[in-house]
Structure formats: C-alpha cells, structure tokens
C-alpha cells in the first residue's frame, strides 16, 4: 500500500516533527508512506472573507497539482463535515481499499482556513477527525498515529485497546 499525506505548510514545531518521524518509521513495515508539503499562503491580518477565499483557492491549486493526475490515487480529504470513523472503521476502510486494488491513497490536509471547494470536489472520501478543532500542524501526527493503529488492528497485533 502507498499512502501520501498531501498537506499545506510545514510542521514547524520540533516535538510535532519528532512525532511525525516516529510514526513514519513505525509504518515502514506496513506501507510506503510519504508526506508531500505545499507552501501555505500568507493570510493578511484582518483578512476579509474574499481574501480568505483567495488564500484557500491558491492553496487548493497547489494541493491539486500535488495529487496524482493520472487518477491512480484514492483521494481522502480531511474536513470537519466529513465522515467520522472510529479506529476500527478506519482499519476496515484501509483493508477494503487494499482488497479492491485501490491501494494508493492520498490524505489531503488543508491549511488553517480549510480546503477550497475544488479540492473537496476531488475527494473520493471525506474524513473528519471529529468535531473538535485541531491546530492544522498537529493533524499529520494524529492521522499517522491512526493509520498506524489501523494497520495494527488489521493484523491483529498488540497496540490497540
């Protein structure tokens, strides 16, 4: 299985970078996982709704360019309006994708303003991490941990309780 996290902006905090690297290492036996980062767009202080929409559009264009243009990836966007999966449901989702030969996944993480409608339209699946709001730089770590947990569940290995 090949999994790409396509995300806006670099993870800047060292403790988050360390966590991301730890889960990338833990995932090596299970899947080929990589993180593709596109630059975030500066948000002017006191930005108007039109300026915020323009920021999301520019970031969205970058995200869309980073996705596989050949349609070989199943695109999963993270959005608060998406489907809430339990850890077991995420495990079943990954197993189902692998079973049906759809084993190339791109998880798309937007910037601090969210995702442009054009990116949402590209989604094969829309996933929510829950109703809470997370600092968008934390999302790669949270998502990688959940993907790791899902592989452990699918293999019946000790980790998930």
From Swiss-Prot:
Cell compartments where the protein resides: Cytoplasm
Keyword vocabulary terms for this entry: Cytoplasm, Methyltransferase, rRNA processing, S-adenosyl-L-methionine, Transferase
CDD domains: RlmH-like
Enzyme class: transferase
Enzyme Commission code: 2.1.1.177
Binding-site positions, S-adenosyl-L-methionine: 78, 110, 129-134
InterPro entries registered for this protein in UniProt: Alpha/beta_knot_MTases (IPR029028), RlmH-like (IPR003742), tRNA_m1G_MTases_N (IPR029026)
Catalytic activity as recorded in UniProt: pseudouridine(1915) in 23S rRNA + S-adenosyl-L-methionine = N(3)-methylpseudouridine(1915) in 23S rRNA + S-adenosyl-L-homocysteine + H(+)
Taxonomy, superkingdom: Bacteria
GO cellular component: cytoplasm
Gene3D superfamilies assigned to the protein according to its UniProt record, in alphabetical order: 3.40.1280.10
A single GO molecular function term of this UniProt record: rRNA (pseudouridine-N3-)-methyltransferase activity
Keyword DNA repair included in the entry's annotation: no
Subunit structure: Homodimer.
Family statement: Belongs to the RNA methyltransferase RlmH family.
PANTHER family: METHYLTRANSFERASE, RIBOSOMAL RNA LARGE SUBUNIT METHYLTRANSFERASE H
Function: Specifically methylates the pseudouridine at position 1915 (m3Psi1915) in 23S rRNA.
Protein name: Ribosomal RNA large subunit methyltransferase H
């Amino acid at each position: 299985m090949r999994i790409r996290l396509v995300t806006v902006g670099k993870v800047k905090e060292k403790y988050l970078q360390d966590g991301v690297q730890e889960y990338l290492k833990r995932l090596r036996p299970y899947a080929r996982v990589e993180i593709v980062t596109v630059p975030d767009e500066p948000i002017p202080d006191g930005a108007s709704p039109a300026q915020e929409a323009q920021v999301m559009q520019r970031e969205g264009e970058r995200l869309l360019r980073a996705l596989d243009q050949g349609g070989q990836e199943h695109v999963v966007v993270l959005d608060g309006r998406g489907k809430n999966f339990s850890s077991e449901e995420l495990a079943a989702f990954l197993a189902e994708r692998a079973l049906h030969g759809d084993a190339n996944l791109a998880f798309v993480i937007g910037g601090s303003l969210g995702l442009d409608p054009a990116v949402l339209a590209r989604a094969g699946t829309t996933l929510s991490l829950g109703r809470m709001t997370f600092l968008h730089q934390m999302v790669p770590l949270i998502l990688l941990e959940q993907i790791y947990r899902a592989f452990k569940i699918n293999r019946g290995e000790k980790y998930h309780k």
